[in-house]
Amino acid sequence: MFSFFLENQTITDTLQTYIQRKLSPLGSPDYAYTVVSKKNPSNVLIISSYPDEWIRLYRANNFQLTDPVILTAFKRTSPFAWDENITLMSDLRFTKIFSLSKQYNIVNGFTYVLHDHMNNLALLSVIIKGNDQTALEQRLAAEQGTMQMLLIDFNEQMYRLAGTEGERAPALNQSADKTIFSSRENEVLYWASMGKTYAEIAAITGISVSTVKFHIKNVVVKLGVSNARQAIRLGVELDLIRPAASAAR
């Protein structure tokens, strides 16, 4: 769905200018407006004042799949500061993304959350840094209602620019319906999440053990994690795993 913005720099610039104008009363802080498809989190829109190099790195590594800020937002509706305990999974280590973000002075922030009508997760993150750190943090906490309405406004502007109410709506909706996993990948991951061994999964699904391992490897790559256990945990946390058709047999 969000490829439309990647392919149309004028529309992207229009949305970015709008966001920056609305945030200017706060002193034009660094920000990120991020939208992630709940059905396929590999689909992401990022409109941000962060350095271009960091955004390219973030996209290339699909960091939204393991970003603690994103993962926390999936499970809540209220705003939160980054200094809270936002790690959802004790066996997933986020040292890579944290160490990299520090190089771009992206360390402390405040995030507002919106679960929208198109089954997407929208976030507005404001970076807190510099001499005015305390003042900005206090203001963001005090004006949560105003900031939340700004996020809603930004999200509506995004859909308006994308034309979901116009002639591009069918194509956008069709793209949004695509899931992150193929049916076979989902089936294999489902049975793995139910505690089945690779041999048991192979017997249930009628494929070879090597094919089961092949699909698990694809899932691990898509989710940007290190192993099957982490893939299962992340799939469960993000509600990406659907009951397999073979479960009804």
Curated annotation (Swiss-Prot):
Which stretches make up the HTH luxR-type domain? 174-239
Q: What GO biological process terms are annotated to this protein in UniProt?
A: quorum sensing; regulation of DNA-templated transcription
Q: Which residues form a coiled coil?
A: none
Source organism superkingdom: Bacteria
SUPFAM superfamilies cross-referenced by the UniProt entry: C-terminal effector domain of the bipartite response regulators (SSF46894), Pheromone-binding domain of LuxR-like quorum-sensing transcription factors (SSF75516)
Any one Pfam family here would be GerE
Q: Per the database entry, where does the chain bind DNA?
A: 198-217
Q: Which UniProt keywords apply?
A: Activator, DNA-binding, Quorum sensing, Transcription, Transcription regulation
* Gene3D superfamilies the record matches: Transcription factor LuxR-like, autoinducer-binding domain, Winged helix-like DNA-binding domain superfamily/Winged helix DNA-binding domain
Which InterPro entries does the UniProt record give?
Sig_transdc_resp-reg_C-effctor (IPR016032), TF_LuxR_autoind-bd_dom (IPR005143), TF_LuxR_autoind-bd_dom_sf (IPR036693), Tscrpt_reg_LuxR_C (IPR000792), WH-like_DNA-bd_sf (IPR036388)
Q: Which GO terms describe its molecular function?
A: DNA binding; identical protein binding
What family is reported? Answer: Belongs to the autoinducer-regulated transcriptional regulatory protein family.
Function field: Functions as a potential OhlL-responsive transcriptional regulator.
The molecule here is called Transcriptional activator protein EsaR
